[in-house]
A protein has these predicted regions:
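Conserved small/polar residues in nucleotide/adenosyl-binding loops
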Residues: 206-213
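Flexible, solvent-exposed short loops/turns enriched in glycine
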Residues: 98-105, 113-172
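Internal alpha-helical transmembrane segments
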Residues: 6-36, 40
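Extracytoplasmic/periplasmic C-terminal soluble domains
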Residues: 152, 156-205
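Alpha-helical transmembrane signal-anchor/signal-peptide segments
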Residues: 38-51
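Short, Lys/Arg-enriched N-terminal segments with co-localized hydrophobic residues
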Residues: 1-5
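Short extracytoplasmic
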Residues: 53-76
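Structured beta-strand/loop patches that form or line metal/cofactor-binding pockets in enzymes
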Residues: 76-108
Length: 217
């Protein structure tokens, strides 16, 4: 009867109080864990970026990651890490991205003073693991789609299926197009920011880098 109802109400209230307590404690713990891991994650990301910059524009004696420049093209913001040696500008690493088969493909591309590609590093991707690991090496020196030494200012990088000069990753034209788009865009950002004459990279208009319509992802 009434006693049982009261007991039930009382135990329900207790349960709510306990659950609320658990939620608050769990939330606080999560926040604490987030705080604990935030710094190491940020440090790991910073180290990964510094390592990638050293791969794509070797030979600098400054700290390019310290003060990146940003440039906006077509509503997209690009980060440019300038490399110098003995105070002389030797090139830059540009962070760029494009949408591949599974999502964003983030690439760091290194250019010398003239705008030639030195190397690249695939920072992150949402492709299937096989495609991602292929893209990480495919366009490197000695790879089937080697882009090193090429200058997108002289000729935009286009996959052979679209009449270009770059061999597509086996069975993945979409990932290849996305990658090359990211590289072309990186060059556009690189040449666009060099208004001070510190680079011999030819500024290119964005239209020059527009790929054939059938190649858009």
């Amino acid at each position: 009867g009434r006693e049982e109802m009261k007991k039930l109400e009382s135990s329900l209230k207790n349960m709510v109080i306990v659950l609320t307590g658990v939620t608050v404690v769990a939330g606080a713990l999560l926040g604490y864990v987030n705080e604990l891991t935030k710094e190491p994650i940020a440090q790991a990301n910073a180290k990964a970026l510094s390592d990638a910059i050293a791969i794509v524009v070797p030979g600098f004696d400054n700290n390019p990651a310290e003060a990146p420049e940003t440039i906006e093209l077509e509503g997209v913001t690009y980060k440019i890490y300038k490399a110098t040696k003995g105070g002389e500008f030797i090139g830059a690493a540009v962070e760029s991205s494009a949408n591949g088969f599974g999502g964003a493909l983030n690439v760091l591309v290194g250019f010398d003073k003239e705008g030639n590609i030195i190397d690249y590093s695939l920072l992150s991707h949402a492709e299937t693991p096989g495609l991602g690991s292929k893209a990480a090496d495919w366009f490197k020196k000695g790879g089937k789609g080697d882009i090193t030494g090429m200058n997108p200012g002289q000729k935009a990088l286009v996959v052979n299926k679209d009449g270009g000069q770059i061999d597509a990753i086996t069975a993945s034209t979409i990932t290849t197009r996305a990658f090359l788009k990211a590289v072309n865009n990186a060059y556009a950002a690189y040449s666009g920011q060099n208004v001070d004459g510190s680079s011999g990279a030819t500024p290119v208009s964005y239209t020059h880098l527009t790929l054939p319509t059938n190649s858009l992802v």
